[in-house]
Curated annotation (Swiss-Prot):
In the presence of PdxS, forms a dodecamer of heterodimers. Only shows activity in the heterodimer. PROSITE patterns: PDXT_SNO_1 (PS01236), PDXT_SNO_2 (PS51130). Keywords: Glutamine amidotransferase, Hydrolase, Lyase, Pyridoxal phosphate. Belongs to the glutaminase PdxT/SNO family. This is Pyridoxal 5'-phosphate synthase subunit PdxT. It catalyses: aldehydo-D-ribose 5-phosphate + D-glyceraldehyde 3-phosphate + L-glutamine = pyridoxal 5'-phosphate + L-glutamate + phosphate + 3 H2O + H(+); L-glutamine + H2O = L-glutamate + NH4(+). Catalyzes the hydrolysis of glutamine to glutamate and ammonia as part of the biosynthesis of pyridoxal 5'-phosphate. The resulting ammonia molecule is channeled to the active site of PdxS. The keyword Lyase applies. One of its GO terms (cellular component) is cytosol. The keyword Lyase applies.
Length: 186
């Protein structure tokens, strides 16, 4: 399968490496037209305000709002998928969640921890960098993981969102789950 990574900012190469380790083809998506070539899309981390500005500039907002592609958002990608963002309007409105930006603190408060992610594994390494958390989930959203009582991973149908950066580790099981359990079944 061909899985795209929105290549406007963030750890694009690292996500593509995880896609390839999962046995699939990774494509850096830089143009809206490329969405026709893929079966699923990863929205990488970075700075969420910048990501939204770039998505507006290159026409991705409307295209992705209207898209039926399965999507996986990490960190800022999670924020972009959310229906609501504390103090702001949602953006793509794909996940029925409310997200709090930077809720784990500033850059100096970044941390790594082992995660037990329902349906994936009990020993996933999570890298949290200025990470958001999911403050509230709506109907149809499955909570997959919490850290210190804060929700950090959810799934709603063909949409997966995590607060952390799985692509910054050698463990590709979260990406593999997205492709082989979400994209394949969509």
């Amino acid at each position: 399968m061909k899985i795209g990574v929105l290549a406007l900012q963030g750890a694009v190469r690292e996500h593509i490496r995880h896609i390839e380790l999962s046995g699939h083809e990774g494509i850096a998506v830089k143009k809206v037209e490329q969405l026709e070539e893929i079966e699923g899309l990863i929205l990488p981390g970075g700075e969420s305000t910048t990501l939204r500005r770039l998505m507006n500039l290159y026409g991705f907002k409307e295209a992705l709002q209207n898209s039926t592609l399965p999507m996986f958002g990490t960190c800022a990608g999670l924020i972009v998928l959310a229906q609501d963002i504390v103090g702001e309007e949602g953006y793509l409105n794909k996940l029925n969640i409310t997200v709090q930006r930077n809720s784990f603190g500033r850059q100096v408060d970044s941390f790594e921890t082992e995660l037990d992610i329902k349906g994936i594994a009990t020993d996933i390494e999570g890298v949290f960098i200025r990470a958001p958390h999911i403050e509230k989930v709506g109907q149809g959203v499955d909570i997959l993981c919490k850290v210190n009582e804060k929700i950090v991973a959810v799934q709603q149908g063909k949409y997966l969102g995590v607060s952390f950066h799985p692509e910054l580790t050698d463990d590709y099981r979260v990406t593999d789950y997205f492709i082989n359990h979400i994209v394949k079944k969509a």
